[in-house]
A protein has these predicted regions:
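Mid-domain beta-loop-alpha active-site segment that forms a flexible
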Residues: 82-103, 148-151, 277, 281-285, ...
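C-terminal catalytic lobe of FAD-dependent flavoproteins
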Residues: 252-263, 273-381
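Flavin (FAD/FMN) cofactor-binding and adjacent substrate-gating region
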Residues: 15-16, 20, 24, 35-107, ...
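Flavin-dependent oxidoreductases
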Residues: 120-273, 295, 379
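Conserved N-terminal glycine-rich FAD pyrophosphate-binding loop of Rossmann-like flavoproteins
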Residues: 1-5, 20-30
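A short coil-to-beta-strand element that immediately follows conserved catalytic motifs
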Residues: 23-26, 112, 166-179, 291-306, ...
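A non-catalytic, amphipathic alpha-helix used as a structural packing/dimerization or gating element
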Residues: 2-16, 42, 46, 99, ...
Length: 381
């Protein structure tokens, strides 16, 4: 329920200025196999309780009919529930960042780019941060807010916070010396065909589609079995990328957490880009879902893509204040969609406690107030 409420708040921020954020409010669909039916039903119940509009379809035949009503070539197997969220959607990343930049610059905020943070100056027993050291000089500060995506590990270490923690699980058992951070390799790519290839039967832009199923997945290239285990993909037509953009469930990075090289990030990394098996798996999964994608492997965009995400022990964000005046937004790879979190953090720093942020405090690990474990192959679902 906590993540549901936080996301509903962020969706309201996206909806507040769709043009500036390049936001497309087409909705979102969670299309799932039997293993996930109860979880998805619970999500629907929780959404209804907070007024977040969604439709829940149960049963294999009912789910197939619902999907065929949207896509007449729908052919995914093993689907027994569909959650169709009417709010939500996606945004064009670069344009959204440009829109955000304009908003803060118009408010008179100083934005300093291309600057490396080298350390912090602290004082007092609580190690309050009084200044930020950079390669261009020192910046004095009253409060420090860190929202740094996968680089949170490095700032966490700079501030002197523990790299391992004690954690009480949902059964009440205590686990010691658990890594605070773990990295997952993100699998993303683009099928270079006209985005209009993926429209609904009535010619409209569809919701963002997320499919999790345990039906066997066979190669669209040679018919060989790719997996008979639970697998998942998401996809959408994207005019920013010029094709069908999406990804598959990530996999864990086995490198010891403090040895993971975050830079260079994304496509420039020699170590952390989408795996060599990803393109065939993802395009085959698209073909598993829609007949229109059969034989589309030659259209896969072959340049490196993807990146890594930095996750907390329960894969949900940590948003809390440390050392008296250091607020950390550790997004646990939820970051981009959590547009409204900055607003909530700002309100807290001005003295107004935010109920929406309470379930995301660091203390939850020791207290055993963890977020639920997902049955999806996606750790952030």
């Amino acid at each position: 329920p906590a993540m549901r409420k936080l996301m509903a708040h962020s969706v309201s921020i996206w909806e507040s200025d769709p043009e500036a954020f390049s936001y497309h409010a087409n909705g979102y669909m969670q299309i799932s196999c039997e293993k996930m039916r109860d979880d998805v039903r619970q999500i629907h119940t929780e959404q209804a309780a907070i007024g977040y509009e969604s439709v829940f379809i149960e049963g294999e035949e009912e789910s197939r009919d619902y999907m065929l009503n949207l896509f007449d070539d729908w052919q995914a197997e093993g689907i027994t529930s569909v959650l169709h969220e009417k709010p939500g959607g996606y945004a064009n990343n670069v344009k959204a960042m440009e829109g955000l930049s304009k908003k803060v610059l118009d408010l008179g905020v100083t934005v300093v780019l291309n600057t490396e943070i080298t350390g912090f100056e602290t004082e007092g027993a609580g190690q309050s941060v009084t200044a930020v050291n950079t390669d261009k000089g020192t910046i004095q500060c009253d409060n420090l807010i860190v929202g740094a995506g996968p680089w949170v590990r490095d700032f966490w270490n700079m501030i002197g916070l523990p790299s391992q923690i004690d954690l009480k699980d949902l059964n009440g058992d205590l686990h010691e010396n658990i890594d605070m951070w773990r990295f997952w390799q993100l699998e993303e790519g683009v099928l270079e065909i006209p985005p209009e290839t993926l429209t609904t039967n009535d010619g409209k832009i569809p919701p963002v589609l997320h499919v999790d199923t345990d039906a066997p997945l066979y190669s669209t290239v040679d018919g060989s079995l790719i997996t008979d285990q639970l697998w998942g993909i998401y996809y959408k037509p994207d005019w920013g990328f010029g094709g069908i953009q999406g990804g598959a469930s990530p996999y864990t990075v086995d490198t010891p957490v403090n040895e993971v090289a975050i830079d260079p990030y994304g496509p420039e990394s020699k170590e952390f880009t989408a795996s060599k098996d990803f393109p065939e798996m993802w395009v085959s999964a698209l073909a598993h879902c829609h007949k229109r994608f059969e034989g589309m492997m030659p259209h896969y965009h072959k340049e490196p893509s993807g990146g890594i995400g930095c996750f907390t022990p329960d894969s949900f964000p940590v948003i809390d204040t440390f050392n008296n005046n250091v607020t950390i937004i550790a997004d646990s790879n939820h970051g981009y969609k959590m547009l409204g979190v900055g607003c909530l953090v700002a309100e807290e720093l001005l003295g107004e406690k935010q109920e929406l942020l309470e379930p995301f405090r660091f203390s939850r690990f020791k207290e055993g107030k963890l977020h639920p474990v997902s049955n999806s192959p996606y750790p952030w679902s």
